[in-house]
Design a protein with these regions (language model features):
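C-terminal tail/sorting-segment detector
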Residues: 642-665
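Beta-strand-rich recognition/accessory modules
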Residues: 1-62, 499, 511-517
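Conserved aromatic anchor
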Residues: 82-102, 595
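Glycine-centered tight-turn motifs at strand-turn-strand junctions
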Residues: 610-640, 651-655
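Beta-strand-rich modules
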Residues: 182-203
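Extracellular fibronectin type III
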Residues: 201-249
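Extended beta-strand solenoid/passenger and fiber regions
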Residues: 294-376
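Glycine-centered coil/turn sites that cap beta-strands in beta-rich domains
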Residues: 87, 555-603
């Protein structure tokens, strides 16, 4: 290659030479190395090209030290009927920018396209008219699928792009989410490409504008194989199979899906199913708590069994981490080995090792069997219905803790009671420290039922601790005989619960008065006034819930097959669902239609109106997929002629379906 000559290789070697680069003269001594940089510049226009060149030069001049966007979140896409469910992790939210030296994450934005390069979404132009920014997905309500932190950053950034005259939109202080259901003009059978990009707010002091993580999907035009980045997805929406029953949480009774094994917390849980495909049948999960601060973990109680070959001083890394050491079993030749003697376990890392310092019965080359359970959710502190818990087994859990307080809604006279005293409940002296996490019953009698633990005043009632999960027991009371002072409780006087312990240890106070704006009805024997409290979770609380996997109603049911259809029908020349020819973009891609709402297992036979078999298609897929494409070719792979065709669906026990379809070319 000669200096100043850029259009010749100056070589006789033939080859597919796409790019030619040249350089001025420079010396290169024996053994010496010179580094060089190459910038490949493209642009929509000359202005766009020169601006890109300036940016490339700036990057070079700063030794490639430029603003780093947040980490890419991991995206999962779940196809549905005219919708797509997306969910992602929160790794981007702890991204550190080495230039600004701060955690500058700001939000998430979703892009959708039928083109893997997303070029049809690069619609936002700069002042030069060049397409520069990508337009976010529009939600069904008309807004952008864009969510950002609630902080001082919102709207257009204060730092415009150099030479572009436009700024990145930082969002509208919506708050963050980690899942989204796209149902805005989602067409079954159409392949969509999604990307979730994380972005930061930039640094005004340094003049660095917002940065957005890349979105890269590579498609091999010869094989149509798709290569996805971690924050992208390719999905085809579809109807579920006929008879499909979506996976869900099991209910222990008609009211609750969760079972309170132990403890006395009154907080609540809810479960959102995001990916029914990932739910395992009859899988039981256990929720446990730790205190100071309150946090909870969820254990998958279905044991995982792995077989490995032992080698001393070599760590065995299991499929899962954050193991429950109490349920960990390691067997060698059918004998259970002892932790700490035969092997060492590192539960949080999910690793086990046999070291030569142990007096172990496990020798090199022994085949060992390992059984364990693990925590898919570990020490979450999200206790206010936050939606940012990680998704596991296709579900996300929401927890709502309660502060210790009186539950005024449930504190009332029990059904069947005739008394209507107005009873005001609160901690003694109004001190929060005198509240206790318990439920009580004030049980009335027609005669003396209890005596004050301080003094000798009597009362025609008893106070019992009836907290769910405890054996009910009677509490000690102190009658505040200050109104009549006749050594007995009188209407208008108060009662205080005396707790166990050294000294005078009091808790709740009950002020019992005549009813306001009502005729007095005295309490009689058998009347009960119930006192309920809201109680926070603590380390005594254990809950369990169980999931049911998706299933198929496989018994014969004529109605299940009635909804089977062909899309489009009639087929007229083309179909918007047909893919492009990636090798020859100007040519049309392969023709296609699809059968919809099929059983997950069935045989499709297509005939001419004279009864000649055209094609047999065997449909065997997952429960959530009732879709099967046909490329409008015969069994010999020839294009079919236009006309009317008969299709027959054989679904075995579920029955049969016959229909017609029209092809107009």
């Amino acid at each position: 290659m000669n200096p100043g000559q850029f259009d010749s290789l100056n070589a006789d070697v033939a080859g597919d030479n796409i790019f030619l680069y040249g350089s001025g003269r420079f010396t290169l001594k024996a053994g010496e190395a010179r580094r060089f940089s190459i910038a490949l510049l493209v642009g929509d226009s000359y202005d766009d090209l020169t601006l890109n060149a300036k940016t490339a030069r700036q990057i070079y001049d700063t030794n490639y030290q430029f603003a780093k966007p947040p980490e890419k979140p991991a995206l999962t896409a779940v196809p549905g009927d005219e919708q797509v469910t997306l969910f992602w992790d929160d790794i981007a939210e702890t991204s550190w920018d080495p230039i600004s030296e701060e955690y500058d994450f700001e939000g998430y934005v979703i892009y959708r396209s039928t083109d893997p390069s997303f070029l049809d979404q690069q619609n936002i132009t700069d002042i030069n008219g060049s397409r520069f920014l990508f337009e976010p997905l529009t939600t069904i309500t008309g807004g952008w699928a864009k969510w950002d932190l609630i902080n001082e950053y919102e709207g257009p950034s204060d730092i415009p792009y150099t030479g572009r005259g436009i700024s990145y939109h930082l969002g509208n202080n919506t708050g963050l989410v980690h899942s989204f259901i796209d149902s805005n003009n989602v067409i079954n059978g159409q392949r969509y490409f999604y990307a979730i990009s994380s972005y930061d707010h930039g640094t005004k002091i340094m003049g660095i504008g917002p940065s957005e993580s890349s979105k890269t999907i590579t498609l091999n035009p010869e094989t149509n194989e798709i290569f996805l980045d971690i924050n992208t997805a390719s999905v085809v929406p579809r109807s579920p199979a006929a008879g499909y029953v979506k996976g869900s949480v099991s209910y222990y009774d008609s009211l609750s899906f969760i079972k309170h094994i132990s403890g006395f917390g009154t907080g609540t849980f809810s479960i959102e199913v995001l990916d029914p495909r990932a739910i395992e049948d009859t899988n039981t999960f256990q929720i446990t708590f730790k205190d100071k601060p309150t946090r909870y973990s969820i254990e998958d109680l279905s044991p995982i069994v792995e077989t490995r070959v032992s080698k001393k001083n070599v760590f065995i890394t299991l499929q899962k981490n954050r193991l429950n050491a109490d349920r960990f079993i390691l067997k060698n030749g059918g004998s259970t080995m002892i932790m700490g003697q035969d092997y060492l376990l590192f539960p949080e890392a999910g690793q086990v090792v046999v070291t030569d310092t142990l007096n172990s019965q496990i020798a090199d080359g022994d085949e060992i069997t390992i059984e364990y359970t693990y925590y898919p959710l570990w020490e979450s502190s999200r206790l206010n219905n936050e939606e940012s818990n990680a998704v596991f087994d296709g579900i996300k859990i929401y927890a709502n803790d309660k502060k210790l307080s009186l539950d005024k809604e449930k504190t009332q006279w029990s059904d069947g009671s005739s008394g209507n005293y107005q009873i005001t409940v609160g901690p003694y002296d109004g001190k929060q420290s005198n509240m206790r996490p318990a439920d009580y019953e004030i049980r009335w009698f027609d005669s003396i039922a209890d005596t004050s633990s301080l003094g000798t005043a009597t009362a025609p009632f008893q106070i019992w601790d009836v907290t769910p999960g405890k054996i009910p027991f009677k509490k000690k009371i102190v009658v505040l005989d200050y109104k009549v002072r006749n050594q007995t409780w009188d209407l208008g006087e108060s009662v205080v619960i005396l707790e166990e312990g050294a000294g005078i240890n009091v808790s709740w106070q009950f002020d019992i008065q005549e009813p306001i704006n009502d005729i007095l009805n005295d309490a009689v024997e058998g009347d009960v006034f119930y006192v309920a409290t809201d109680r926070p979770f603590n380390n005594e609380d254990i809950y369990q819930f169980q999931m049911m996997a998706s299933s198929i109603q496989s018994e014969k049911n004529e109605g299940l097959l009635d909804d089977i259809r062909v899309v489009p029908n009639p087929y007229v020349v083309t179909n918007i669902l047909e893919p492009l020819d990636r090798q020859n973009p100007r040519d049309r891609g392969p023709r296609r239609i699809y059968f919809d709402k099929l059983p997950n297992e069935c045989t499709i036979r297509i005939y001419t109106i004279t009864g000649e078999l055209v094609k047999t298609i065997y449909h065997n897929t997952t429960f959530d997929n009732g879709q099967e494409f046909w490329d409008l070719t015969t069994k010999d792979n020839f294009p079919i002629a236009f006309g009317i065709y008969i299709y027959h669906i054989d679904a075995g026990k579920m029955g049969e379906k016959i229909g017609r379809l029209a092809i107009i070319k």
